[in-house]
């Protein structure tokens, strides 16, 4: 049974365009299925998480990452008697707006769009789901419930101060109450993202030999698991060791998240979802100690992995591709596919830049490379 403060699909605020409910799926299950059937979701399998798809078959991509986040989110929500369908759905959609080549691609595209209000993958996720996906005759987008869209837009909490242009535009027709916190399920999806990416980026980085087990000594709360496992299993292989460490880390983080969230719910005597939205802090959270550990881990990954020679060299090439494609299309808009060119409002530069950014953001890594090579055939980029 759902808690009184859960997001009940039977009490959903509904969809922008009214639809008749189905008898065999609740509203959040319908949204999950709609997301899975989008082109944007399928393209995630060829978009970078940390390592370019060509680097190896076992490294995570945006699709596998999204699936892993969704399993964590669903488990946590179920344990707290919240809507596991909503938590899972938001988790599956949270990375839809990412560019090719991960954060390097996003930084490059944001720099290209500096004069045109920038680029945000979070806002791009909303744009994909409410405008760019063309699957229904009656409307653009996939017409998701209010609760799912709220959770995607408020992935990092309430939106205060300057608001992204597309989010502000959409909010005029479907008020997502940007200044409040999202549902508990959405908060779970956001922290499930943290749990998944810090754990699995560590795993992939060791697999890629960017870091080793000795370097994990900097993270004492993780290193203790390494020491314990080596002591217990004298002949444990490196591949098995990292799997065991990651498994323990994920369990530890989830357990901590559940404990602290239950404490917060009891302390605030939460009885309904509006109380969660109107609190002055996030109800779903880790303990103070674990938040500190997570912050240290993110710093470690940033310094030792994302800024490593290997990742920096790849990022440089990725930046060249994204910025090169942007310039090429802006210089000659006729190189865009006809259906994209039709989206431009006359030949106005701002509109042209936004359409070009939308087109590039939707590319997979391999399509971006192929397109760049085709348009710049004198200098093929093949050494990924």
Curated annotation (Swiss-Prot):
Keywords: Hydrolase. GO terms for molecular function: dGTPase activity. Disulfide bonds: none annotated. PROSITE patterns: HD (PS51831). The keyword Hydrolase applies. The keyword NAD does not apply. Residues 62-198 form the HD domain. GO terms for biological process: dGTP catabolic process. It comes from the Bacteria. HAMAP family: dGTPase_type2. Belongs to the dGTPase family. Type 2 subfamily. PANTHER family: DEOXYGUANOSINETRIPHOSPHATE TRIPHOSPHOHYDROLASE-LIKE PROTEIN, DEOXYNUCLEOSIDE TRIPHOSPHATE TRIPHOSPHOHYDROLASE. This is Deoxyguanosinetriphosphate triphosphohydrolase-like protein. The lineage of its organism: Bacteria, Pseudomonadati, Pseudomonadota, Alphaproteobacteria, Rickettsiales.
């Amino acid at each position: 049974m759902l808690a009184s403060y859960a997001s009940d699909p039977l009490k959903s605020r509904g969809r922008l365009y009214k639809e008749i409910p189905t008898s065999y799926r609740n509203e959040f299950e319908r949204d999950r299925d709609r997301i899975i059937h989008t082109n944007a979701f399928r393209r995630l399998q060829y978009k970078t998480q940390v390592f370019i798809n060509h680097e190896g078959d076992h490294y995570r991509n945006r699709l596998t990452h999204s699936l892993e986040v969704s399993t964590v989110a669903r488990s946590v929500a179920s344990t707290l008697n919240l809507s596991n369908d909503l938590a899972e759905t938001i988790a599956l959609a949270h990375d839809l707006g990412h560019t090719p080549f991960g954060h390097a691609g996003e930084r490059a595209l944001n720099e290209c769009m500096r004069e045109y209000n920038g680029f945000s993958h979070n806002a791009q996720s909303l744009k994909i789901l409410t405008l760019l996906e063309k699957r229904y005759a009656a409307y653009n987008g996939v017409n998701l419930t209010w609760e799912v869209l709220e959770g995607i837009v408020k992935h990092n909490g309430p939106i205060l101060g300057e608001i992204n242009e597309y989010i502000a535009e959409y909010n005029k027709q479907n008020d997502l109450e940007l200044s409040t916190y999202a549902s508990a399920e959405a908060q779970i999806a956001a922290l499930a993202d943290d749990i998944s990416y810090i754990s699995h980026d560590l795993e992939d980085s060791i697999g890629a030999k960017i870091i080793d087990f000795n370097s994990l000594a900097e993270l004492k709360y993780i290193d203790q698991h390494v020491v314990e496992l080596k002591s217990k299993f004298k002949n444990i292989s490196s591949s098995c060791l990292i799997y065991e460490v990651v498994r323990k880390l994920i369990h530890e983080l989830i357990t901590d998240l559940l404990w602290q969230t239950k404490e917060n719910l009891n302390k605030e005597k939460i009885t309904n979802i509006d109380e969660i939205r109107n609190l002055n802090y996030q109800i779903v959270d880790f303990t103070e100690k674990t938040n500190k550990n997570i912050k240290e881990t993110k710093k470690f990954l940033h310094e030792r992995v994302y800024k490593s020679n290997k990742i920096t060299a790849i990022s440089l090439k990725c930046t060249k591709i994204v910025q090169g494609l942007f310039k090429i299309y802006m210089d000659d808009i006729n190189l865009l596919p006809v259906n994209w060119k039709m989206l431009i409002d006359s030949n106005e530069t701002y509109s042209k830049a936004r359409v070009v950014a939308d087109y590039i953001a939707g590319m997979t890594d391999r399509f971006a490379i192929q397109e760049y090579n085709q348009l710049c055939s004198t200098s093929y980029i093949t050494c990924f």
